[in-house]
Structure formats: C-alpha cells, structure tokens
C-alpha cells in the first residue's frame, strides 16, 4: 500500500463533502478541515453550517472557518497542521502563495472541467451552455493563478442531450473522488506526471447571473434549449409575463424554419408552447409561475391560456 498522507481538506458545498467522505475511507489521515464561515439561510436567515462542516464534525475532525487566509495568524493554522498535502475542492477562498507552499507536496484542486477548457467559477454550466460533447474533472497542482496549475490527472464523461447542470454535477461528484484518490496515490508513490496546460486552448467559465438566465428570444432554439439545461437548477431560465417571472424547466427544439419575429407564440397546445426564436422554434414543456410548483405546459394552459395567445410576443 502507498504511504498514508497527512491531508488538510478545504471545501464548502455538497460537491466538496462527497470528496471529503471519499478521503475518510481512503486510509489517509485528514488532520484538519477548512470551510467557509456559517451563512444565513432559509426564511429565518438562521446561520447554517456548510455540508463540509457538518460531515467534519460528525467525524470529529478539527474544523477551521477563517474569513480569509491572508492574515498571518490564519496561515499559521495551516502551518501548525504539518500536512503533506492540502486538497481543495470548491472552497471559495483564495489561497495565498505562502499557503500553497506550506504542505510538503503542495496543494491540489479538483476542478469540474477538462482543463484548460473552462477555467473559472461555472465550468459545469458553461460546458452545457456551449454544447460540449464531453466534460470531466481535472486534478491539478495549484499555483497562484486561476485554475492555471499543472494537471495531474483527468477523468472524462459524455454530456447527454438530457443532462442538466444538476445531473452533470452528480456525475462529476462521482468522478472527482475517484480521480482524487488515484492522484494522492501517485503523489505518495512519486509517480505523478504533471502536465503543463496549453494556453492556446484556454476558455473561461464566467460566473452565472440571474439576468443572464432571462430568455433572449433572438438566440437560436438550440442555444436556448442548452441554456435551459445549463441553468437548471440555478439560476433557472426565465421569462416575464404580465410583470411576473416564469421559470422554464424543460424545452425542446422544433427544427422548422419560421419567419415570425423572435418571441412570437406560434402554437399553444397539449404538445407544448411553441415560440419563434432567432433560428428555429423552441417548444416550452415545463414551466413554473411565481409562487407555484413546476407544471407541464398543458397544466399551465388550463389555468393561464390568456398568457399564451398565438400571435402575441413574449419579451
């Protein structure tokens, strides 16, 4: 068996917690866990711990929640743990150069794309949005840049026509721990083969916004259908009707040309709500008016047919 490593884990959401769980079953020694401070959540704005903190406390691991790792005293928390390696998964804080250099084997990161494609904050969503045929995870050696470090290990998976960001997130949350455990074994054995990223292939996965998720009917039906899957479950594609936001959960592309202006309602029936776009027709299948649950287009038409009169335009 490979050497058992002393590991600091740094992460915050459920995606990170799944990696911590795998580490705890791997035979390595997790000596400390860093996660973001508790945040207000829910209607009562009660302070809630991160999924990583919940798991770490269940396992009686030391938990640290600094607001920043820039202050010297917070960097000392890392140094005192005398780790071989620091594993970073969706932590949300910048690691200064001094911290990156503290562990014997440095810091490694699990990133939700096949680098150098989709560096940045929203790689899962952007891969769907762009119509990529595949994605995956990259385990990389961290440096001071944004996802610029040498690649240590990659695992890929296909993107299907049904995938949403939610389903892709789950797939990568399965792949990531596999890649992480393999990489740690290679680091412990001295067999890791770092690969420099090709800067000519870099793309950036910019952070999502609710405004970006508003449906722009001038785009093609194919692009809009991908957006709807990419922005599900957050921030959710939406349109506005009579001043109310209506979320769109599912749609399909009807590959028929139309001369109607983008946003024009062409048909509204049990097959869906067909709307002209910049190229082709988008068929809305599942929608969610404000304050309601998601429902089929047919159910929405039963209660709000006046919203979808053929010939009218959605803006």
Curated annotation (Swiss-Prot):
- Signal sequence extent: none
**Known catalytic reactions:** L-methionyl-tRNA(fMet) + (6R)-10-formyltetrahydrofolate = N-formyl-L-methionyl-tRNA(fMet) + (6S)-5,6,7,8-tetrahydrofolate + H(+)
What are the GO cellular component annotations?
cytosol
Residues involved in (6S)-5,6,7,8-tetrahydrofolate binding: 113-116
Tell me the Pfam families matching this sequence.
Formyl_trans_C, Formyl_trans_N
Known EC number: 2.1.2.9
> Does the record's keyword annotation contain Secreted?
no
Q: Please give the Gene Ontology molecular function terms for this protein.
A: methionyl-tRNA formyltransferase activity
Q: Which InterPro entries match?
A: Fmt, Formyl_trans_C, Formyl_trans_C_sf, Formyl_transf_N, Formyl_transf_N_sf, Formyl_transferase-like_C_sf, GART_AS, Met-tRNA-FMT_C
ATP-binding as UniProt keyword: no
**Keyword annotations:** Protein biosynthesis, Transferase
Alphabetized NCBIfam families for the sequence: fmt
The record describes the protein's role as: Attaches a formyl group to the free amino group of methionyl-tRNA(fMet). The formyl group appears to play a dual role in the initiator identity of N-formylmethionyl-tRNA by promoting its recognition by IF2 and preventing the misappropriation of this tRNA by the elongation apparatus.
Give the UniProt family note: Belongs to the Fmt family.
- What is this protein called in UniProt? Methionyl-tRNA formyltransferase
- Its source organism is Escherichia coli O17:K52:H18 (strain UMN026 / ExPEC)
Lineage, highest ranks first:
Bacteria, Pseudomonadati, Pseudomonadota, Gammaproteobacteria, Enterobacterales
């Amino acid at each position: 068996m490979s050497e058992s490593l002393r590991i600091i884990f740094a992460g915050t959401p459920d995606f990170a917690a799944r990696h911590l769980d795998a580490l705890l079953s791997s035979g390595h020694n997790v000596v400390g866990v860093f996660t973001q401070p508790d945040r207000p959540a829910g209607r009562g704005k009660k302070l809630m711990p991160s999924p990583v903190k919940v798991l770490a406390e269940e396992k009686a691991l030391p938990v640290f929640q600094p607001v920043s790792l820039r202050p010297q005293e917070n960097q000392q928390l890392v140094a005192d743990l005398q780790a071989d390696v620091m594993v970073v998964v969706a932590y949300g804080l910048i690691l200064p150069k001094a911290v990156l250099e503290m562990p014997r084997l440095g810091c490694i990161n699990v990133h939700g794309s096949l680098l150098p494609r989709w560096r940045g904050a929203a790689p899962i969503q952007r891969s769907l949005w762009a119509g990529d045929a595949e994605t995956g995870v990259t385990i990389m050696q961290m440096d001071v840049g944004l996802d610029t470090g040498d690649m240590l290990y990659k695992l890929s998976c296909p993107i299907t026509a049904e995938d949403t960001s939610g389903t892709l997130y789950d797939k990568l949350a399965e792949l990531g721990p596999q890649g992480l455990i393999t990489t740690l074994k290679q680091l412990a054995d001295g067999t890791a083969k770092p690969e420099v990223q090709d800067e000519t292939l870099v793309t950036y996965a910019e952070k999502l916004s609710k405004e970006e998720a508003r449906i722009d009917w001038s785009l093609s039906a194919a692009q809009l259908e991908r957006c709807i899957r990419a922005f599900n479950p957050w921030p959710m594609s939406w349109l506005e009707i009579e001043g109310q936001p209506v979320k769109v959960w599912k749609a399909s592309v009807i590959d028929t040309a139309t001369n109607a202006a983008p946003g024009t309602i062409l048909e509204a029936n049990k097959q869906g709500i067909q709307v002209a776009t910049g190229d082709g027709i988008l068929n809305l299948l599942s929608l969610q008016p404000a304050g309601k649950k998601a429902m089929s287009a047919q159910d929405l038409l039963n209660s709000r047919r006046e919203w979808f009169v053929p010939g009218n335009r959605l803006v």
